[in-house]
From Swiss-Prot:
Phylogenetic placement of the source organism: Bacteria, Bacillati, Cyanobacteriota, Cyanophyceae, Acaryochloridales
Segments passing through the bilayer: none
GO molecular function, one term: structural constituent of ribosome
InterPro entries hit by this protein: Ribosomal_bL28 (IPR026569), Ribosomal_bL28/bL31-like_sf (IPR034704), Ribosomal_bL28_bact-type (IPR001383), Ribosomal_bL28_sf (IPR037147)
Annotated gene: rpmB
Family: Belongs to the bacterial ribosomal protein bL28 family.
Signal peptide: none
Name the UniProt record assigns to this protein: Large ribosomal subunit protein bL28
PANTHER family: 39S RIBOSOMAL PROTEIN L28, MITOCHONDRIAL (PTHR13528), LARGE RIBOSOMAL SUBUNIT PROTEIN BL28M (PTHR13528:SF2)
């Protein structure tokens, strides 16, 4: 599994590290991903997901079923 949020699809961003003399070197800005066990009340079980911290905040607001439906994810396959 890659470094990608399973609900939002967030992934790394290609960027430049710019020095004081303005030399630019490529760098990767990784998404802030965390492994999170989320309770799925409809199935009465835990689901382990790799989520960005922004997705964790949204998950607390919307709930797992609504967020997964919105993202088009089948939680039975996770």
């Amino acid at each position: 599994m890659g470094k990608k949020c399973q609900l939002t699809g967030k992934k790394a961003n290609n960027a430049f590290a710019v020095s004081h003399s303005h030399r630019r070197t490529h760098k990767l800005q990784e998404a802030n991903l965390q492994w999170k066990r989320v309770w799925w009340p409809q199935e009465k079980r835990w689901v382990k997901l790799r989520l960005s911290t922004k997705a964790i905040k949204t998950l607390e607001k919307k709930g797992l079923a609504a967020f997964a439906r919105e993202a088009g994810i089948n939680l039975n396959q996770v």
